[in-house]
Amino acid sequence: MHTYPPTLEILPLAKPVDCTASVPGSKSITNRALVLAALAPMDVDCVLVGALRSEDTEVMVTALQTLGFDIEPNWNAPEPTIRFRFQKKHRVIPAASAELFVANSGTSMRFLTAMVATGEGRYRLDGVERMRERPIRDLLDALNQLDGVRAISEVRMGVHPSLSRRRALRAGLYTSAPA
């Protein structure tokens, strides 16, 4: 079990990242790379090589496309690739609203819930019946500390977070209660 400090300062990078990394095939790592590529301020296409194809990663690609990102997966290549085509972004999340279905993908639910909180609009996430039993309250509570974010669970403390944002996020200190 990890022990984290009560406060963790996250500083913006001084310059854009220009690197190549080889990572093990993993749906969780592929989904993290997809979110990072979608949010990256890039002025060229971004290609993820060796992405793991799974239900979770296909769900994430479809959700990002629904959010307005120009993504083209090629799952049949010798090394599967996912290309993000450059598009001038006027918004962090291109779509002002979206209904996202994450099937049974817990990583997609959590990553997308946090990701859409950076956008300006209204986003609703749903999944299969089993997803509605999985807890997400800790994440919703953390997101509700952000100025302008309203993250709610439509049923119990389960899934269905509807996230509404009306203005840009402001810098500040946000905390997570110890477990």
In which residue ranges do the predicted regions lie?
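Structural preference for solvent-exposed beta-strand-turn elements
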Residues: 1-179
